[in-house]
């Protein structure tokens, strides 16, 4: 990994504060890897999976040069990178979703994403946002450190070793899985933590060669930054014999909240402090999948104070018995729902319940009588708590109903399955000459215009009849989740996220339209996104084109579409 930093004086700050420009080079290529012991072709970042940690400090500017060296004709050969959770103020052109904010990067070309970080801090991640490509390995962690972190007194260690990127893993390429239309193939074969896992954990030794190992010293406190980079899997995370104190969710600092375990959906991040206060030994880091049967991820926590040779943890790891609703989901039948498109650009543009195996102290420390699982509704923001609209009604309420067409296999919002346009939404807005209206977008683009400087509430419900939780992600914003299902609303101190779980019972959240850009809203189950579970909100389109919050684009951004338009029709 190539990385350089240099200091740039920023005269806009009062007291001559210095901000850095932090540069990275990411080479995207194909290669064979076996993170769970089974070899397959994958899409790699700098030769590995997951990609390297990208990190910077509050106020820095990130410059990431992405080089496309993809060659495998059986996998996706163009690419595009999304920086999940970065707000991208005046910078929507570098948000990354293909055909929303940019054209893909073609093979043997490069593109440099330049991203001023402003006041953002916290745990994020980056991944391909071209079709289902990130399922094949193109994903990695991203952390923005805060030199004045309000939680700094709660932990001693916060470094690259305490970043845990967890994710499901497949032995078949995502392109091949989608081509079959067989939903059962969307179940992952295994899961990894920091690129290590066991396909057959009952018959594969648990040791530092097969599992990620976090070494700790007794008496020290460690800030874990847990990232769920999955295509579908949700996990329940715990550490054998240890409690954790949650201090952030999706990059938002929260009031400290002590738990024994927490659930984490695809796309979400949880920061939690664990104190190494047990007897020096080896302990399981457990992460059973909660929406896929008989799959689990593990890592090892080893005390450096333990002078004995390596020995595995006492007792088996945790497993999970999925609910009847999850079993029903994996048994349901639907048609082929792939909505790829993109082939016409050249012509258009030219230019459940826990199942414990073995000793109960795997979950509960000795003498404990209860196990505390994180309640998401108790994640209170540390700074500026309260709903975006305050105690007043929202200026605009948008009702969104998701569901699935069991005949076609398409997931839909308000009856429309999203299909990526041939021309990126941002380019269409920037080249419009007579005022952007919703009629400028085709029905499959499913694009709604949001007025600027309003408080908006999304009311999202489902009618699929399938009991799976959909992780809903909105680009360009964090939002305040004011109601989960039929629970009482909370406008005083609701959780603030950028990914929230939605069932058919629904979820409501609020945000202010203070960031002009075309922002993608979609299910972060990548299979559902590919089957149409998405739409675009064109926020303040006239402000995108001109004014103090406009989105300036450069020649290299424009060249992306020129180069992509020269590819053969259907090349992706």
Curated annotation (Swiss-Prot):
Pfam families: Cu-oxidase (PF00394), Cu-oxidase_2 (PF07731), Cu-oxidase_3 (PF07732). PROSITE patterns: MULTICOPPER_OXIDASE1. Cu cation 1 binds at residues 82, 473. Binds 4 Cu cations per monomer. Its cofactor is Cu cation. Its EC number is 1.10.3.2. One of its GO terms (biological process) is lignin catabolic process. Residues 1-18 form the signal peptide. Keywords: Copper, Disulfide bond, Glycoprotein, Lignin degradation, Metal-binding, Oxidoreductase, Repeat, Secreted, Signal. GO terms for molecular function: copper ion binding; hydroquinone:oxygen oxidoreductase activity. Cu cation 4 binds at residues 470, 523, 528. Belongs to the multicopper oxidase family. This is Laccase-3.
